[in-house]
């Protein structure tokens, strides 16, 4: 009888050792946005020093992004930011992740300016030129196509994944009146700015190399 009583603890300890060996800790969160009976698991490993990044959908997915959005809204509140630009790269998972992010930010009272499919520099340009100086890029960066993640700047300052991790379990009530989600095309403004800042002698012959990989 004693053997069977201690068996669950031995089993748990062996699982813990196996998980710890791969430095793979999980945050268990009650999902209030969708199904109250469902527990959402988010692995700590996606919260990096400079960004948030993981394999889709095992490590980062729409439900995880909803919790990340809540943490971002808390960070925005701390910085007195009420509006933020969002964009995505060309990964297939980017569309649904961006929609989940925008919807959650709106529900937590943050106005979302969706600039759509853009490069990361263009997202940073949009953030810099806006009054709120804040932006979120859905991108897996240089990683393979099954990855995706988030790069973040708030109030003209980069925000690390570890900062968001500290806020992920914090509580915040959803707004009774969700904030706006608006679409904006900023590509022409970006191109004009680039052209204005690059002076080329029209008499000089130049060679131009274009990398179309991304």
Where are each of the predicted segments found?
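Hydrophobic alpha-helical signal peptides and transmembrane signal-/tail-anchor segments
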Residues: 8-15
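Gly/Ser/Thr-enriched, mixed-charge loops and adjacent short helices
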Residues: 148-214
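N-terminal small/polar loop signature for handling phosphorylated ligands or for N-terminal nucleophile
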Residues: 83-147
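An N-terminal, well-structured beta->alpha segment
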Residues: 38-103, 107-108, 183-208, 212
């Amino acid at each position: 009888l004693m053997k069977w009583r201690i068996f669950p603890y031995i089993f748990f300890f062996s699982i813990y050792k196996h998980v710890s060996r791969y430095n793979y800790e999980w945050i268990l969160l009650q999902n209030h946005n969708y199904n109250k009976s469902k527990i959402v698991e988010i692995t700590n490993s996606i919260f990096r020093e400079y960004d948030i990044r993981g394999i889709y959908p095992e490590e980062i997915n729409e439900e995880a992004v909803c919790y990340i959005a809540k943490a971002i809204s808390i960070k925005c509140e701390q910085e007195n930011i009420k509006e933020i630009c969002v964009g995505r790269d060309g990964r297939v998972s980017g569309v649904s992740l961006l929609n989940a992010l925008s919807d959650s930010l709106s529900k937590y009272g943050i106005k979302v300016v969706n600039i759509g499919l853009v490069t990361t520099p263009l997202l940073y340009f949009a953030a810099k030129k806006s009054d709120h100086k804040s932006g979120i890029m859905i991108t897996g960066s240089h990683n393979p196509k099954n990855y995706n993640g988030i790069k973040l700047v708030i109030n003209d300052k980069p925000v690390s994944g570890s900062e968001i991790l500290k806020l992920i379990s914090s509580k915040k009530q959803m707004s009774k009146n969700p904030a706006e989600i608006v679409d904006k095309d900023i590509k022409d403004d970006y191109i004009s700015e680039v052209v204005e800042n690059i002076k080329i002698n029209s008499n000089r012959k130049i060679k131009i190399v274009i990398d179309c990989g991304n």
